[in-house]
């Protein structure tokens, strides 16, 4: 009888593991292949060879790139090279990417930038918020952008127990932000287990010098985050659930879920066109190819444009798709004056004139 019970439990356990494995492949879109949707006036950006995971653009056309991300389980073309922040002036006739100097005293050797966000204060001071993973830990760095010197002055490093696995950040004040945790745990094995079992424990946290609190939870893997031009709504990409969540910002900075937009792809970072409110999304058509890198079958890239997301029938347009022959692993797409920038997790970046 005891052996029968043991065999029954073993069978149930194996069946559960098998079901979870198949479910994970579905969440990763592991069987998806794509056909290219090209744009005519595009070129690869010189000087970006190891990824531009996130991009943020100021109203004056200065674009910031976080480059050189190293992440457990992800391929890297330069595993020993520190990351950095690059800048490109999109108002120039032939814009080029330049690396920004960082103030003395900041640990550049372990700089591993991930999601970024800018904030302009009432006195026109520009702050750059950077999710950083020094030695695969989790911090948010706040810099002051010094345009005359093309440099960043490091102001503050933020660590908190509610920020165990930070992915992206949207600044809402000089020391205030919302951040996504793509996992509940910080330990790599527990992260893997959390993903495999689809526990949906990822969340969004609000940080200010006065308080830090959980404001939204129940995500499979909360990834990109951004805010509407009128500052009333926060958008969160749930990458493994293929969803964008629309959350209404409350006076106390809590978030209330308003709606969920289902998409058939892995949605990464979200960028907002300030003039129209359109959401531009860098996507991964096949997530398995990101983690099992094969140069003969590289990860593909996809850019979506979402219009009128607050309406009953938002418009979703596929702007660009590439099978990896040009661009591998697109993580962000952002627009400025009909100029489109597309960044990737660990490869190149694309500049297009629409």
Swiss-Prot record:
Location relative to the cell: Membrane
EC number annotated for this UniProt entry: 3.1.1.2, 3.1.1.81
Domain of life: Eukaryota
Membrane topology value: Peripheral membrane protein
Catalyses which reaction(s): a phenyl acetate + H2O = a phenol + acetate + H(+); an N-acyl-L-homoserine lactone + H2O = an N-acyl-L-homoserine + H(+)
Cofactor: Ca(2+)
Keywords, sorted A to Z: Calcium, Disulfide bond, Glycoprotein, Hydrolase, Membrane, Metal-binding, Signal
GO molecular function (one): arylesterase activity
Cofactor binding, note field: Binds 2 calcium ions per subunit.
SUPFAM superfamilies xrefs: Calcium-dependent phosphotriesterase
EC top class, as a word: hydrolase
BP GO terms, sorted: lactone catabolic process; response to oxidative stress; response to toxic substance
Alphabetized Pfam families for the sequence: Arylesterase
GO cellular component, one term: plasma membrane
Active site: residue positions: 114 (proton acceptor)
Residue positions binding Ca(2+) 1: 53, 167, 223, 268-269
Modifications after synthesis and translation: Glycosylated. The signal sequence is not cleaved.
Residues reported in the UniProt entry to bind Ca(2+) 2: 54, 116, 168
Similarity remark: Belongs to the paraoxonase family.
The protein's role, per its UniProt record: Capable of hydrolyzing lactones and a number of aromatic carboxylic acid esters.
Record protein name field: Serum paraoxonase/arylesterase 2
Native source organism of the sequence: Rattus norvegicus
Phylogenetic classification of the source organism: Eukaryota, Metazoa, Chordata, Craniata, Vertebrata
């Amino acid at each position: 009888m005891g052996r029968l019970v043991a065999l029954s439990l073993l069978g149930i356990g194996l069946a559960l593991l098998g079901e979870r494995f198949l479910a994970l492949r579905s969440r990763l879109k592991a069987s998806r292949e794509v056909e290219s949707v090209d744009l005519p006036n595009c070129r690869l950006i010189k000087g970006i060879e190891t990824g531009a995971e996130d991009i943020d653009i100021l109203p004056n056309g200065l674009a910031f790139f976080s480059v050189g991300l190293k992440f457990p389980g992800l391929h890297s073309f330069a595993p020993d090279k520190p990351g950095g922040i690059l800048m490109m002036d999109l108002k120039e006739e032939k814009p080029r990417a330049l690396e920004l100097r960082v103030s003395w005293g900041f640990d550049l050797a372990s700089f591993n930038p991930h999601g970024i966000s800018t904030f302009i204060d009432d006195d026109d001071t520009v702050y750059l918020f950077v999710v950083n993973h020094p030695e695969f830990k989790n911090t948010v760095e706040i810099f002051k952008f010094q345009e005359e010197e093309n440099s960043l002055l490091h102001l503050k490093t933020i660590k908190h127990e509610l920020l165990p696995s930070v992915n992206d950040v949207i600044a809402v004040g000089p020391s205030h932000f919302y951040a996504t945790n793509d996992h509940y745990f910080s330990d790599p094995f527990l992260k893997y287990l959390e993903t495999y079992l689809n526990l949906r424990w990822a969340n969004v946290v609000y940080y200010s010098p006065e308080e830090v609190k959980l404001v939204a939870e129940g995500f499979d893997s909360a990834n990109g985050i951004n805010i509407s031009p009128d500052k009333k709504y926060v958008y969160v990409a749930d990458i493994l659930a293929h969803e964008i969540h629309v959350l209404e910002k409350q006076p106390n900075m809590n978030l209330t879920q308003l709606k969920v937009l289902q998409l058939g792809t892995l949605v990464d970072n979200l960028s907002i066109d300030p003039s129209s409110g359109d959401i531009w999304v860098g996507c991964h058509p096949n997530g398995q190819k990101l983690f099992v890198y094969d140069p003969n079958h590289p990860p593909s890239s996809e850019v979506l444009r979402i219009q009128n997301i607050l309406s009953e029938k938002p418009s979703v347009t596929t702007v660009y798709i590439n099978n990896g022959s040009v661009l591998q692993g697109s993580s962000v797409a952002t627009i400025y004056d009909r100029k489109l920038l597309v960044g990737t997790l660990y490869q190149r970046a694309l500049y297009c004139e629409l």
